[in-house]
Amino acid sequence: VPPGFTPF
C-alpha cells in the first residue's frame, strides 16, 4: 500500500 494508506 502507498505511504499514509492504512487498510492492508
Curated annotation (Swiss-Prot):
Species of provenance: Pithecopus hypochondrialis
Tissue specificity remark: Expressed by the skin glands.
Transmembrane helix listed as a keyword: no
Protein name listed in UniProt: Des-Arg9-[Val1,Thr6]-bradykinin
Gene Ontology terms: cellular component: extracellular region
Gene Ontology biological process terms from the UniProt entry: defense response; vasodilation
Function: Produces in vitro relaxation of rat arterial smooth muscle and constriction of intestinal smooth muscle. May target bradykinin receptors (BDKRB).
Family: Belongs to the bradykinin-related peptide family.
